[in-house]
A protein has these predicted regions:
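Short, basic/aromatic recognition patches
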Residues: 2-23
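Short secondary-structure capping/turn segments at boundaries of alpha-helices and beta-strands
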Residues: 12-14, 24-27, 39-41, 63, ...
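A generic local secondary-structure boundary/capping motif
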Residues: 14-15, 65, 129-134
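Short, surface-exposed loop/turn motifs at beta-strand boundaries within globular domains
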Residues: 19-21, 69, 137
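Short beta-strand segments
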Residues: 21-57, 88
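Charged, gly/pro-rich active-site loop segments
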Residues: 85-166
Length: 166
């Protein structure tokens, strides 16, 4: 009998940076484990971290999206540039959909958060806007529920799994 899926229990610090909106890097490997990596142009995380949506420019993410379609695996890293606090999530069962007008508030909130966050390390709003530029008709949303989580903050705990909830 298959084990029921559990979800990682994310601590309050990791949840806070994820919900607020920090740098998000999305990756997926092909069947030969060759990775494809893209910067997200937005994210939305539920308060408890059980539902995550990351937004990508579809035209720039074709290989990554093919990899997700082929392997149904995804890894996403949330990293706070000013502190380097970083959490990596892994998941299967990824739902890919076109972004819609309903996603615009999440994309705008992400841009605002990243403008503040990157401003802390001297990156101005013009560069942030260019880095996260998108056309809504080119944006896809990848929705998932995390199955694994790892502390990737540089230091002695880097790479350690975050304990799972029962």
């Amino acid at each position: 009998m298959a084990q029921p899926r559990t979800r990682p229990q994310l601590n309050a610090d990791f949840l806070a940076i994820m919900v607020r909106g920090v740098s998000v890097i999305v990756s997926a490997s092909d069947p030969d484990l060759v990775p494809s990596v893209m910067r997200a142009v937005g994210s939305q995380v539920s308060a408890e971290g059980e539902h995550v949506t990351v937004y990508l420019n579809q035209s720039q993410s074709k290989q990554l999206l093919r990899n997700v379609a082929t392997t149904d695996r995804l890894a996403v890293v949330f990293s706070e540039p000013s502190t380097h606090r970083t959490v990596q999530l892994k998941a299967r069962g990824v739902r890919v959909r076109e972004a819609s007008e309903a996603d615009v508030p999440a994309l705008q909130a992400y841009l605002a958060s990243m403008t503040v966050e990157l401003g802390k390390i001297g990156i101005g709003p013009t560069l942030v806007a260019a880095m996260l530029a998108h056309r809504l008709d080119d944006v896809v949303a990848l929705e998932f529920s995390p199955e694994e989580a790892f502390d990737q903050t540089p230091g002695p705990r880097a790479g350690q799994p975050i304990a799972r909830a029962a």
